[in-house]
Amino acid sequence: IYGATLVGSPFIGIGFNDYLGWAHTNNVHDGQDLYKLVLVDGGYKWGDDSKPFAIRTVKLKVRGADGVLSEKELTIKESVHGPIVREDEDYAYALRVVGQDQPYIFEQYLEMALAKNFNEFQKAASRLQNPFFTTMYADRDGRIMHLFGGRTPVRPAGDWDWLGTVPGDTPQTLWQDTHTYTELPKVIDAKSGWLQNANDPPWTTTLPRELDRRDYPDYMSRNFMHFRAQRSARMAYEDDKITFQELLAYKMDTRMELADRLVDDLVEAAESSDDKFLHKAAAV
């Protein structure tokens, strides 16, 4: 297995072997929620009743400037949502994050690295022990896959507004489960023969589109395609057969979609200006 580790990870996070390879990008993914709790009677409002906070103390070893370790106590206050990260006179804010009960990420990545075909790799990836990331896969048999991976909470309703502060005084907003592997957006063996992703949502990983956003909850991911992804998709879409050397050139491409759309208008505006400096800029 060859590849690179991600910062802080003692395993190959992006890699390849004699049979297949994979890479990751950041998926536009909401795997956490910040709940606003109403403080009452030393606890917090919960439906028509109230609940007390759970309080525990942990001991941490902290290395000082002199290199000596000292023991510090940290008091953690929790609601049913998760730990309290902020509190004022009337409200407290609790953070709920996916992945707290997924301790087998090392096993998953070892299985991915040892896989010899698509089925073996997919079996490993379907464990979803990594709470986020898009996975882009290709193998020597010509199979390709885009997986919008990680753990996405099964929310009762709503859209991307869950990215903001969520009312925490009702059981109706508290999610318990996450979407299964089969429920996540993915494109396997795209008809176009190519996939791309540049830290953007999964809907335009290939063109023509093979994912319909309406088949998924509105909170699954946002709906946009930024300029970097547009440039990536354009290069693949406009080339029927990409050679390895072309692929390397596309990888290092510095042309900007935004510039292509604005330069002509900017030059025209500069040339019509009374500012001689802008005339020089337009000439360049």
What is each residue range found by the language model?
Residues 1-283:
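Mature extracytoplasmic enzyme cores
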